[in-house]
């Protein structure tokens, strides 16, 4: 099963991917993780990426695609994979398609998790993290027993810069500009299935499974 999960920041892609990994015993491939690993291992593409990163430049698509290919060639991807954070643009999607053809592989499912912008803002801006132990909370959905203090160590809770409303709105704007066109791209490829990314974690997981198992209407 070769799957792409699409959705804006805060849609819950990471949470759903973890459940799918456990169920299907396939790897979740995060471009951030594999980029760092390729640089650390000094793979051919990792060496190229290192040069761009050290100069402060964006790593070009052809290098990112090459690093994805290096990862997909590993044995743990033989039974499938979940792509997380890639592709981000139509150009990357096109490059991925042609790369997979060369590898005699293809994407089987593209699941788009739709969540209202205000819901996303509430999810993200409500996050709080303990400065001492790193435990996460949410002011609405998972509040601490004592406001502003960690249940475990009584450390101060803080809001990460990435979780502040202004930053989050900018991230959502970038998603709309760059990544949302992927929805049209994969619709044209007859691969896209959209689900509501709201409700319980189990409810959302069942919607994804119904697509994978061919029972989604």
Curated annotation (Swiss-Prot):
One of its GO terms (cellular component) is cytoplasm. It is found in: Cytoplasm. It holds the Pfam family ADK. Zn(2+) binds at residues 130, 133, 150, 153. Transmembrane segments: none annotated. Keywords: ATP-binding, Cytoplasm, Kinase, Metal-binding, Nucleotide biosynthesis, Nucleotide-binding, Transferase, Zinc. The keyword Cytoplasm applies. Gene3D superfamilies: P-loop containing nucleotide triphosphate hydrolases. It catalyses: AMP + ATP = 2 ADP. Pathway: Purine metabolism; AMP biosynthesis via salvage pathway; AMP from ADP: step 1/1. Residues 30-59 are annotated as: NMP. Disulfide bonds: none annotated. AMP binds at residues 31, 36, 57-59, 85-88, 92, 160, 171. GO terms for molecular function: adenylate kinase activity; ATP binding; zinc ion binding. GO terms for biological process: AMP salvage. Its EC number is 2.7.4.3. Coiled coil: none annotated. Monomer. Belongs to the adenylate kinase family. Catalyzes the reversible transfer of the terminal phosphate group between ATP and AMP. Plays an important role in cellular energy homeostasis and in adenine nucleotide metabolism. This is Adenylate kinase. It comes from Geotalea uraniireducens (strain Rf4).
């Amino acid at each position: 099963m070769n799957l792409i999960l699409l959705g804006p920041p805060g849609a819950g892609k990471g949470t759903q991917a973890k459940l799918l990994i456990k169920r299907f015993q396939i790897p979740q491939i995060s471009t951030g993780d594999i980029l760092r690993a390729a640089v650390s291992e000094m793979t051919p593409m990792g060496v190229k990426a290192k040069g761009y990163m050290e100069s402060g430049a964006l790593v070009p698509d052809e290098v990112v695609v090459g690093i994805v290919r290096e990862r997909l060639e590993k044995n743990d991807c033989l039974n499938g994979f979940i792509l997380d954070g890639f592709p981000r643009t139509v150009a990357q999607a096109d490059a991925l398609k042609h790369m997979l053809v060369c590898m005699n592989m293809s994407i089987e499912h593209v699941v788009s998790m739709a969540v209202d912008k205000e819901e996303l803002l509430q999810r993200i801006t409500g996050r709080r993290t303990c400065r001492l132990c790193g435990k996460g909370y949410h002011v609405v959905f998972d509040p601490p027993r004592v406001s502003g203090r960690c249940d475990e160590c009584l450390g101060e809770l803080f809001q990460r810069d990435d979780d502040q409303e202004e930053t989050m709105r900018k991230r959502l704007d970038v998603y709309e500009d760059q990544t949302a066109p992927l929805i049209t791209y994969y619709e044209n490829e007859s691969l896209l299935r959209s689900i509501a990314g709201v409700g319980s974690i189990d409810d959302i997981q069942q919607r994804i499974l119904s697509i994978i198992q061919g029972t989604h209407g």
